[in-house]
């Protein structure tokens, strides 16, 4: 399939550009490169991240805040991070501040508790997001506003809030919800309505669906396209990032990588042909800094590669089998894979589950990822292994029914209406999903439970909820809590029961985001069991100059993980065949038994 190279035309670019896609496909790099191209064409551009796990700072090599910051060396380009936690704190203070000194301290504390849930973080970030679109004054000094949006699940929720909260405000009668006084939202009614209109205006807004030449990423882009189109965002284009072509006909690794990409693109041809589609070639280096961003969209740069240095010795790492052998000694417990979107959490979780099951253990593999690709990675059955997905819609409906049955029976019509209204809040979904998460962890007392968790930002919100959860349930007057809910945080903090594996790629952003996640876990008194460096090209034997450049660039990050971040590290090589289904996962397990990097001695 002959697809054009992605280019940004300043003459036809809409004022608002959104980049979305499966975690790890390159949304940040492409949004930054696009903003750079527009600015260098003389446009005034504001680049914005609304991602709780934003790595915009790292790509731009500039410390950003929630106010526009000029990017050195690029006149006309400003960038900012909408930090959800900071936005939530500001939102709480905006609502509570005027009441200080007027209400008793106990009442103020109660309000703060009601505004401490994760959906307050969501709506506060959305509040700033809408201001940039719906308020003509907010971005009046810019020709273009480019949004580096979050991994897909979060993006869909962020987009859908525009309609969901507009409808909620239309039907609300109580003036309060788990978000606190609705007056804080109602003041922004005109801005919200303008945002909804702008998102649906093809002359104002373009949605750039970013994908990779991989089946899961392209399937996710297609799903996202349909859902956002249903939300009214119809002006869409697809960019397939990291497309690889080799000039080395005898290179097994290069040919396998090229063949895999071609097969994925051909399988998605109907979707690709349904909207404007372009590609970005794979580059030999990680995209960091302004110069790296220029290389990303430079058609002549694909052959640039640095020579491999002599004398570099790889750090000692373990095999995945070493970790599983240690894990299985306990006989039961919970294994959780965490990390940036797109690093292979699902694949590693599925491989561990298959390895444990093949060793005769009872294993349950479950996903809390809104994108839920685990079924695609494990498209078959293994004796002793069961599989489930935590479905937010089903869990929310079940939770709503349970609360209505427990509380609503003794209420009058007005009371039931108020309760129903409160349960329509987005916070209810977080609680319902959290309950399901706790239930899965609780099952680890008599078997192994492997949790394929969501990308970093969502995972942190999920873990954060563990301490805020009890307060929120008390607010909804639940009389008793399941034992697994009450014991969850204790179990997560027990290293003999819960093993958390931080999954990363040997690249700058995945490594540094995994390190940040490790610090967040440690602040919650949760210690990771090990790191897993996935998809390494080290010792691939490739003679392709571009892949040699990729291999050279990953060496510093392999060394950094072992020397700086991890006390225990496993290494997984890049696989010529994409590991989907139990047979391929078994082969991945076999390959990890013979790591090219020497195994660390106990």
Which role fits each region the language model picked out?
Residues 17, 335:
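Conserved beta-strand position immediately N-terminal to the Walker
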Residues 54-59, 87-91, 153-157, 218-219, ...:
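Switch/connector loops and helix/strand junctions flanking conserved nucleotide-binding motifs
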Residues 47, 54-120, 372-424:
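P-loop NTPase motor core
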Residues 18-82, 149, 159-163, 342-395, ...:
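Walker A/P-loop NTP-binding active-site region of P-loop NTPases
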Residues 10-11, 37-41, 71-74, 135-140, ...:
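Conserved catalytic network of the ASCE P-loop NTPase/AAA+ motor domain
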Residues 47, 144, 208, 237, ...:
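Hydrophobic "anchor" residues on beta-strands that sit immediately upstream
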Residues 100-223, 410-509, 513-516:
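Phosphate/Mg2+-binding loops and adjacent switch elements
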Residues 1-11, 63, 195-332, 493-498, ...:
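C-terminal lobe/tail of nucleotide-utilizing enzymes
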């Amino acid at each position: 399939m002959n697809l054009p190279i992605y280019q940004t035309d300043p003459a036809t670019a809409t004022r608002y550009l959104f980049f979305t896609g499966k975690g790890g496909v390159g949304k940040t790099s492409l949004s930054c490169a696009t903003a750079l191209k527009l600015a260098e064409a003389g446009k005034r551009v504001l680049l914005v991240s609304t991602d709780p796990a934003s790595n915009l700072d790292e790509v731009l090599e500039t410390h950003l805040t929630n106010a526009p910051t000029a990017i050195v060396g690029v006149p006309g380009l400003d960038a900012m991070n909408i930090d959800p936690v900071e936005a939530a704190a500001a939102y709480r203070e905006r609502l509570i501040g005027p009441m200080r000194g007027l209400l008793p301290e106990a009442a103020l504390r109660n309000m703060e508790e009601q505004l401490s849930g994760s959906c307050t973080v969501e709506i506060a970030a959305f509040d700033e997001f809408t201001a940039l679109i719906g308020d003509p004054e907010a971005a009046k000094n810019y020709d273009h506003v480019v949004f580096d949006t979050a991994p897909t699940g979060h993006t869909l929720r962020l987009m859908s809030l525009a309609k969901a909260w507009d409808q909620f405000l239309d039907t609300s009668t109580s003036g309060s919800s788990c978000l606190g006084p609705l007056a804080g939202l109602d003041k922004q009614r005109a801005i919200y309505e303008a945002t909804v209109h702008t998102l649906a205006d093809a002359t104002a807004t373009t949605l750039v669906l970013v994908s990779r030449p991989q089946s899961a990423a392209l399937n996710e882009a297609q799903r996202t396209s349909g859902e956002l189109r249903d939300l009214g965002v119809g002006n869409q284009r697809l960019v397939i990032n990291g497309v690889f072509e080799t000039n080395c006909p005898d290179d097994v690794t290069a040919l396998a990588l090229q063949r895999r990409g071609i097969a994925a693109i051909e399988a998605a041809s109907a979707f690709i042909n349904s909207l404007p589609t372009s590609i970005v070639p794979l580059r030999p280096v990680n995209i960091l800094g302004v110069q790296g961003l220029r290389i990303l969209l430079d058609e002549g740069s694909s052959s640039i590669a640095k020579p491999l240095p002599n004398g570099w010795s790889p750090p000692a790492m373990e095999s995945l089998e070493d970790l599983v052998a240690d894990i299985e000694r306990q006989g039961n417990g919970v294994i959780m894979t965490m990390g940036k979107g797109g690093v292979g959490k699902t694949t590693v979780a599925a491989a561990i589950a298959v390895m444990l099951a093949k060793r005769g253990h009872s294993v349950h593999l479950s996903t809390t990822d809104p994108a839920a690709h685990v079924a695609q990675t494990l498209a078959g059955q293994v004796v002793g292994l069961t599989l489930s997905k935590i479905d937010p819609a089903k869990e929310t409906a079940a939770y709503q029914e349970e609360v209505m049955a427990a509380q609503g029976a003794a209420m009058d019509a007005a009371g039931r209406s108020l309760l129903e209204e409160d349960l329509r809040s987005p916070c209810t979904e977080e609680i319902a999903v959290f309950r399901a998460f706790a239930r899965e962890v609780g099952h680890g007392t008599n078997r192994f439970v492997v949790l394929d968790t969501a990308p970093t930002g969502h995972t942190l919100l999920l873990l954060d909820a563990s301490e805020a959860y009890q307060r929120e349930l008390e607010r909804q007057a639940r009389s008793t809590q399941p034992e697994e809910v009450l014991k969850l945080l204790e179990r997560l903090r027990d290293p003999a029961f819960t093993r958390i594996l931080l999954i990363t790629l040997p690249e700058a952003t995945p490594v540094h985001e995994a390190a940040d996640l490790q610090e967040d876990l440690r602040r919650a008194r949760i210690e990771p069991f090990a790191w897993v460096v996935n998809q390494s090209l080290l010792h691939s034997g490739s003679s392709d100059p571009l892949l040699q450049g990729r291999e050279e660039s990953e060496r510093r990050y392999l060394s950094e993980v072992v020397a700086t971040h991890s006390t225990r590290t496993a290494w997984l090589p890049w696989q010529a065949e994409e590991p989907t289904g139990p047979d391929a996962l078994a082969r991945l397990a076999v390959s990890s038994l013979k790591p090219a990097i020497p195994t660390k001695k106990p």
